[in-house]
Amino acid sequence: MVEDILAPGLRVVFCGINPGLSSAGTGFPFAHPANRFWKVIYQAGFTDRQLKPQEAQHLLDYRCGVTKLVDRPTVQASEVSKQELHAGGRKLIEKIEDYQPQALAILGKQAYEQGFSQRGAQWGKQTLTIGSTQIWVLPNPSGLSRVSLEKLVEAYRELDQALVVRGR
């Protein structure tokens, strides 16, 4: 089981779709060696060094957290049903209402659209909010994603810089 890493007062909570088998086996988020999450958040400026999956709790030192839409691990996120994503979106709203981070970053357009019953999402900041929490849709850093490392870092850096501008 991959536990959430959440606390009050966070700048951002990154929300993956669901744990892969590597994460489920180790208990650490974004644990597959091909997953670029840790590299991307470092290069985008969220952390001052590249953390390892087993150091995930240290995200809190940087006022960052992680969660997921669906708890069930799969080989590929495409194995998660629309119903699971929709139910996960409802649970996620409750979590975010409790913790009220500055931003929630959903990692994937389809995950956002199905989890929040939205259509035609674009990358970046969304008009939908959860209380005072901004919702952002960022490309998924999975090794299965075709998005280049450069584009991932650019998208995540936009969020980091927006939070800096807000004084967070």
Curated annotation (Swiss-Prot):
Listed GO biological process terms: base-excision repair, AP site formation
Record bears the keyword Protein transport: no
EC number(s) per entry: 3.2.2.28
Keyword DNA-binding: yes
Keywords associated with the record: Cytoplasm, DNA damage, DNA excision, DNA repair, DNA-binding, Hydrolase
InterPro entries, sorted: MUG/TDG (IPR015637), MUG_bact (IPR023502), Uracil-DNA_glycosylase-like (IPR005122), Uracil-DNA_glycosylase-like_sf (IPR036895)
Subcellular location(s) per record: Cytoplasm
Catalyses which reaction(s): Specifically hydrolyzes mismatched double-stranded DNA and polynucleotides, releasing free uracil
Enzyme class at the top of the EC tree: hydrolase
Main location: cytoplasm
CC terms in the record's Gene Ontology section: cytoplasm
Subunit (UniProt): Binds DNA as a monomer.
HAMAP family for this protein: MUG
Function of the protein: Excises ethenocytosine and uracil, which can arise by alkylation or deamination of cytosine, respectively, from the corresponding mispairs with guanine in ds-DNA. It is capable of hydrolyzing the carbon-nitrogen bond between the sugar-phosphate backbone of the DNA and the mispaired base. The complementary strand guanine functions in substrate recognition. Required for DNA damage lesion repair in stationary-phase cells.
Family stated for the protein in its record: Belongs to the uracil-DNA glycosylase (UDG) superfamily. TDG/mug family.
Protein's UniProt name: G/U mismatch-specific DNA glycosylase
Source organism of the structure: Escherichia coli O9:H4 (strain HS)
